[in-house]
Amino acid sequence: MTARPSSLAIALSCAAALLVPPVAVAGAAQLEEVAQPAGTVGFIVVRENGSGSASAAQSYLDALLTSLAKRAGWPAASGKYFTKRSKAKKFIEETKPSFGFFSFGAYLGMRKANGLTAMGVADANATGGAQYFVISKSAFTLDACKGKTLASNHADDARFVDVVVSGDAFDLADFELVETKRPVQTVKAVINGEAECALIDDAQISTLATIDGGAAVHPVWASEAMPAVIIASFGSAPAEQVDTFAKHLEALCEGDGKGACDAAGLTAPRKVEADAFAAQQAAYDG
């Protein structure tokens, strides 16, 4: 889920907010400073643990929503990109968006509180979150990593890792956790011997060959594939908006939206049934 720093593609995204026409999308600063036209449809992107530039992801989102607003016949669409649920929560409370693009863990973690309903999924190049791996230099099985140090920048939501990512293969408590902040820091912790093993995602494993010492690292376990991007409606979204968005969801990356999607690495947006992730939701909710 080439390493374009499309932190989204989830997110999503190429014209900047400075070029916004009347029927358009407000940039991050404009969202806070300029009143939106009546009927503006709100969006949010929550993309956790991604690599790349958040400001670039925001510009891609702005461009994508500009295209979507025109296609859907909305007066305007505006959105903001976040890498932390805590910061996204305040934005949601203040602006009450109708729709969101989420990494899978963020979707599961924010679903109940916000009445989120899955509408679609999309693939995303080099943004991560589509599959997870345990890697090591010295261990050759997952069991050999248990009880040892495990570096990860994906441990903020232990429940997501324990009941969804691992598929019951392990719990984070099975390891001596070494929490990291940046994707490359996690990989280098194993390369430099600061941790015996590491939990990383598909974006990180794709960079191993480009990092000094990366050739000595190998996967010892892999998760099932997961959706890179969940497209969801909020419980407060008007039914008319939901119906309209559903009609245009699979055309997000067509026409004027193609450039934004290409820049963000977003591909193949497609609709799903509302209960498509019922099993994962039930497991996460406990």
Give, region by region, the residue ranges found by the protein language model.
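Bacterial N-terminal signal peptides
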Residues: 9-22
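Signal peptide processing junction and immediate N-terminal pro/mature segment
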Residues: 21-30
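Extracytoplasmic small-molecule ligand-binding "clamshell" domains
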Residues: 31-108
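Periplasmic-binding protein-like
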Residues: 36-50, 124-134, 213-253, 259-286
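Bilobed "Venus flytrap"/periplasmic-binding protein-like clamshell domains
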Residues: 46-70, 105, 128-188, 192, ...
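Short helix-initiation/N-cap motifs at beta->coil->alpha
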Residues: 79-90, 176-188, 225-227
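Acidic, polar ligand-binding/catalytic clefts
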Residues: 82, 87-145, 156-158
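A ligand-binding cleft/hinge motif common to bilobed small-molecule-binding domains
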Residues: 101-114, 191-219
